Regions:
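Gly/His-enriched, cation/cofactor- and phosphate-binding structural elements
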Residues: 1-76
């Protein structure tokens, strides 16, 4: 019930990138998050992006930016 944000990271070895799929509930904009941090975009509740970092570094980056969105995530 309390889940507002979901993320999937897919390693595309052929393209040499990490593909990121973001989903949210309510008014939390994964579009804004994706545009700001992962060269992507989409809709308020469904967006995608990419990273040229390794899978591990991409996940670390994602985790490191979450505190910036803490208030918005907790307001949902």
């Amino acid at each position: 019930d309390g889940i507002v944000l979901a993320a999937i990271f897919i390693e595309d070895r052929k393209e040499g990138i990490i593909k990121i799929s973001l989903r949210s509930k309510g008014n939390f904009s994964v579009n804004e998050m994706s545009r700001a941090h992962f060269e992507g975009g989409g809709h308020t509740n469904a967006a995608g992006g990419k990273s040229h970092l390794s899978l591990q570094k991409t996940i670390e980056k994602f985790i490191s930016i979450l505190p910036r969105y803490n208030k918005a995530l907790n307001d949902e």
